[in-house]
Design a protein with these regions (language model features):
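Short, well-ordered alpha-helical microsegments
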Residues: 48-50, 99-102, 123-124
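A residue-level signal for conserved active-site and pocket-lining positions in enzyme catalytic cores
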Residues: 4, 78, 92, 96, ...
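Glycine-rich phosphate-binding loop signature in dinucleotide/nucleotide-binding domains
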Residues: 83-88
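Domain-level signal for Mg2+-assisted phosphodiester chemistry and nucleotide/NA-binding surfaces
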Residues: 1-73, 107, 112, 120
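Acidic, metal-associated active-site segment
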Residues: 74-80
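Acidic, PIN/NYN-like endoribonuclease modules and their adjacent C-terminal/linker elements
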Residues: 110-143
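A short acidic, amphipathic alpha-helical/loop segment
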Residues: 77, 101-106
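Acidic beta-strand-to-loop metal/phosphate-binding motif
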Residues: 41-43, 89-95, 102, 116
């Protein structure tokens, strides 16, 4: 799981609390059917990293300062060469176009790529690169 937490929370991510992060991640986990032993990498700006670590209990929280810092950090950690051969499915929790080349590469290698975004918040490039697209807030409404 490649989780751009800022993208999942939305425009008000700067003031996100541990409870808010846990709530959006619980919805994400249910939506994609995440298992307890799944591998997660989280991306967040340096100002949000501590809250994400507390919310997840994970030290796999990456982020750089500056524009698209969380995206760039996640892409540096999760390259297609490392993923191919170890996994058969990758979930990208973001709508950002920056993840489209990774999704396209993984899908081209035969992996199932699930993209999860907020409603109306996925780039066309990432949408077409994915095997499937799930939307937070819509998948659980019918449950």
């Amino acid at each position: 799981h490649v989780v751009d937490i800022e993208n999942l929370i939305g425009p008000d991510h700067r003031g996100a609390t541990v409870d808010q992060i846990q709530a959006v991640l619980a919805e994400y986990r249910e939506l994609v059917g995440a298992k307890e032993d799944d591998l997660f990498f989280y991306g967040a700006n340096p100002g949000l990293r501590v809250q994400v670590m507390l919310a997840t209990g994970s030290n796999q929280v990456r982020g750089y300062k500056g524009k698209d810092g969380a995206d760039r950090a996640l892409l540096d950690v999760v390259g297609s060469d490392w993923v191919v051969g170890q996994f058969d499915r990758v979930c990208v929790a973001s709508g950002d176009h920056a993840f489209a080349p990774l999704a396209r590469s993984l899908k081209g290698e035969g992996l199932h790529v699930t993209v999860v975004s907020r409603p109306m918040s996925v780039s066309a490039e990432l949408y077409t690169a994915a095997s499937e697209h799930l939307v937070l807030g819509e998948g659980l409404a019918a449950a």
